[in-house]
Amino acid sequence: MRPVAPKPGKRVLLERIGFIWKHLSFSQKNTFRNLFRYKKRLIMTVFGIGCTTGLMVVGFGLKDSIMNIASLQYDNIQLYDAMAALNTDETDKLDDPDKTLNEIMENESGIETFAKVSMKSMDISSGSNVRTAYTVVCKDAQALESMMVFQSRTTKKTYELTDDGVILTEQMAEALGVGEGDTVSITSGENAPVTAVVAHVMENYLMHYVYMTEGCYEKVFQTEPEYNMYWLKLNKDGRANEDALGQRLMDHDEILTVTYVSTTREMIDGMLSSLY
């Protein structure tokens, strides 16, 4: 009347290794039996664990890369601390704008050094590829050396701004499909496009930029640049009292706004922190 006993199951290889098998729990023994007996389950288990581990590695790598963007940009490339936008309606009234504005900056003890720049949004194109970028022209290229690092991302070779060509940021150069020695078209507003030679391609992580000297700008556009901004590098005291410094600068009619890199960094870090 007793039911027929089931056929004895096949023993897996691990069962023959007694000193290991005896120390396994029931659930562990059951797991190993299922894995060795059912090859599809074994393959799916190994494949699943491998894919999951791979995704975790990629995820952690992306997190580290993304979270370091602000630090890479503002600690290694753009080294200035603030941007003071000029009120051109007021500066145009001055007999000697450079002298007046330079005196304003020099009288602020919190400002270590400064550079007068022209910064405008323009369309950069090559063939059918078009990107919008900030075109930056510095009145004194040497003054920019302490505020910008023009270098290759891969070799870390540093570049100098010259009148022979422009420096493009890497992501834009890739999007346009251009490199050193190629030419790009630059369109400012409703004006006809002009062409410029790409002298170098530089490391960059936030937004697109085209950098050129005053001489290069005049050669390309056949006109003088309109300077509308000062880049400021602050000392320790200036960084500790940014609000007060900004307010004093904006008390001058010639200064329209003051924007701090620290504020931009906080905004970027805040947006990125929401990703995890």
Each language-model region and where it sits:
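Alpha-helical transmembrane segments of integral membrane proteins
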Residues: 1-44
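Peri-transmembrane interface segments
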Residues: 62, 66-75, 242-276
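Hydrophobic secondary-structure segments that place a key small or acidic residue at a functional site
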Residues: 157-216
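Small-residue-enriched segments and motifs
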Residues: 133, 184, 196-199, 229, ...
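Juxtamembrane segments of multi-pass membrane proteins
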Residues: 26-163, 170-171, 182
